[in-house]
Amino acid sequence: MGSGMKSKGVHQISNNIVTALKEYFNDRIEGFTIYNITDIPYPMFSIRFTLYNYYKIVYNYDRGRNGFSISIGRDGIGLKHSQPWFDDIDLGVLCKELDENVRIRIPDKYLAYYNW
């Protein structure tokens, strides 16, 4: 989805991200909330959702920079990924890296119980 996506506006970008997450994670993801959305004075928004019925995840987009964190109360644990700038993003890779970062933190017995 790479270059040019930023010019679509934050509503279209946030919808594209939610769609990509739903397609990648299917029944392992739920409860999307898009908030703090604005185009002026600069584009930014956040998306909160539950992954594997285990973690609350927050995706933040701020002036082209983007990333995920695991929400723990008012704090978050940042999740590393290879695509910090949205203009160069491959949403498939972003989802795969999110999946790897989250699954490594969830007990294997829990994932096996749900056939994940």
Predicted regions and their residues:
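Mixed-charge, Lys/Arg-enriched low-complexity segments
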Residues: 2-13, 76-116
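Amphipathic alpha-helical segments
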Residues: 10-31
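Generic secondary-structure transition motif, activating predominantly at the C-termini of alpha-helices
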Residues: 25, 29, 33, 99-102, ...
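Residue-level signal for the start and early helices of compact helical domains
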Residues: 16, 23-25, 36, 40, ...
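Amphipathic, interaction-prone secondary-structure segments
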Residues: 27-72
